[in-house]
């Protein structure tokens, strides 16, 4: 009985580590998968760029509001090494809704259920964004819509370093 209990505790600890919440000023967790475009991606391979990972739902009114702001900032700063990755948290049956919205705004995206590897927790309110600096360190975690002021405060300083 004691052995089974110890095994259960070890399994719970391992599971909680796998779904740990990423912490600011710590290395960004792993994130790998295949984009809607069919291209593979690996967040670790994006070192040298500032990356905004945005958890998104096609049913979220705040997500719909902010996606135009994401596109505008991305278009104005991608030449400085800025990338946006939209992670759709909708059910796979709604993949077409997320893919259409992401494509309409010229961003790259993936469905959370299609990820090959993710160290990000799967239960974020949408939208939730993580900004990762050029060294692969998580610099901010923000819930709610991203406004132009958000980009000026949290992303622009990382691009000008």
Language model region names:
Residues 43-61:
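Short active-site neighborhood of thiol/selenol oxidoreductases, capturing the structured segment around
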Residues 19-43, 109:
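N-terminal "domain-start" segment that seeds a small globular fold
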Residues 52-53, 84, 129:
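Hydrophobic beta-strand anchors of alpha/beta hydrolase catalytic cores
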Residues 101-107, 113-156:
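Thiol/disulfide oxidoreductase modules built on the thioredoxin-like
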Residues 47-49, 79, 107:
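Active-site acidic short loop of glycosyltransferases
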Residues 64-104, 114-118:
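Structural microenvironment flanking redox-active thiols in thiol-disulfide oxidoreductases
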């Amino acid at each position: 009985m004691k052995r089974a209990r110890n095994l259960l505790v070890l399994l719970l600890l391992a599971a909680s580590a796998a779904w740990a919440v990423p912490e600011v000023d710590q290395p960004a967790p792993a994130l790998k998968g295949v984009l809607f475009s069919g291209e593979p991606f690996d967040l670790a391979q994006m070192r040298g760029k500032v990356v905004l990972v945005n958890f998104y739902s096609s049913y979220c009114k705040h997500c719909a509001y902010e996606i135009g702001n994401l596109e505008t900032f991305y278009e104005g700063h991608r030449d400085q090494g800025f990338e946006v990755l939209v992670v759709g948290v909708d059910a796979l049956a709604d993949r077409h809704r997320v893919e259409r919205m992401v494509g309409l705004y010229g961003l790259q995206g993936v469905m959370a259920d299609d990820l090959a590897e993710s160290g990000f927790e799967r239960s974020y309110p949408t939208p939730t964004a993580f900004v990762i600096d050029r060294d692969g360190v998580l610099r901010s975690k923000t819930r709610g819509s991203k406004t132009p002021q958000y980009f000026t405060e949290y992303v622009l300083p990382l691009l000008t370093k």
